[in-house]
C-alpha cells in the first residue's frame, strides 16, 4: 500500500482564470484537527473554497484507553485535584460544567450500573458545547504526545478520562441489557471532501458524536456523508436526549465502499478493532506495554495533505 499522500487528487473549481492555490502539509497525521477544520471552514466573500483530505490513522492523537489502570487513574485525578486544574485553564468552562451538572440533576434519572455522576456530566458537558468540541479536539491532536507535554499542556485530563470510561461502561451495559454489540450511525462534514480507498483502514482520532438518524446527520453539512458501523461506540441518548452514539478516538474502521455524488462523497465504514499509541499516560506508564495489535501500520505514510483552492469571482 503506497503513501496516502500519493492518492490525493486535486479538486479543480470551474474558473476562467488560474486558481490561487495554497498547499498545506500537516505532519503527524492530525486528522482530528482536520475534522475540526471541516466544521469551522467557511468560504469568504468573493471566493470559493474546497478542501480535499486523505484519511490516515491520526497517529499523533491522544488515544489513551486506560487499559489495566482505570481505577488508579480515577484515584489520581481526584487526589491531584485535576478537575480544578483543568477547569481553571479554560475560560468559561466552570460555568459550562455547572450547566451540564444542573441539566443532569434536572433529568432526575438513575445512573446506569457502575457509572458516577461525573460520567453523566462529562457526556453532557461534551455534547452540549461546541466550543468544548473545538478546544478538546485541538488539544488531543497536538499537546499530549509525551508524558511531560501531557502533564504540562493537556488541560483535558479529567474530561478525556471520564468520556473514555463512560463510553466503555455504556457499551458493556448495552451488551448486557440489549445484546447490542454494534450500531449503524451517520456523520456529515461541512465544506470538506474526505477521500479514502475501498479496503483502507482508518480511524478518526477524536471523540466523534454521530447520529442514529440519517436525516438528522444531513443537517451537519453537504460534502461528505459517513455511514459508520461502530462496535466500540456507545449510545448516549439516555443523557443527551438525542439519538447519538459517541465513537472513541481509538476505534479502527475499514472502508467498505466509497461513492461520489453531486453533493459530495459517501463513505461506508465498518469497525475492525482498535489501536492506541498511549496508555495510562497520567501514571507515566509506557504505552508500549498496552498497545492493541489488530492492525500493522508500519508500512503506511503518516503524512496528510490539505489542498485549498481559492477562486476569485469575476
From Swiss-Prot:
Localization per record: Cell membrane
Membrane recorded as keyword: yes
Cystine pairings recorded for this chain: 69-280, 182-231
Ribosomal protein listed as a keyword: no
Superkingdom per UniProt: Eukaryota
Enzyme Commission numbers on file: 2.4.2.31
Binding positions for NAD(+) per the UniProt entry: 126, 206, 240
GO MF: NAD+ poly-ADP-ribosyltransferase activity; NAD+-protein-arginine ADP-ribosyltransferase activity; nucleotidyltransferase activity
Proregion span(s): 286-314
Principal location listed in the UniProt entry: membrane
Lipid linkage positions (GPI-anchor amidated alanine): 285
Boundaries of every TR mART core domain copy: 91-276
Catalytic activity: L-arginyl-[protein] + NAD(+) = N(omega)-(ADP-D-ribosyl)-L-arginyl-[protein] + nicotinamide + H(+)
Leader sequence residues: 1-46
Coiled-coil blocks: none
Topology class, membrane: Lipid-anchor; GPI-anchor
Residues with attached carbohydrate: 114, 178, 222, 257, 274
GO cellular component terms listed in the entry, alphabetical order: plasma membrane; side of membrane
Family: Belongs to the Arg-specific ADP-ribosyltransferase family.
Protein name: Ecto-ADP-ribosyltransferase 4
Originating organism: Pan troglodytes (Chimpanzee)
Lineage: Eukaryota, Metazoa, Chordata, Craniata, Vertebrata
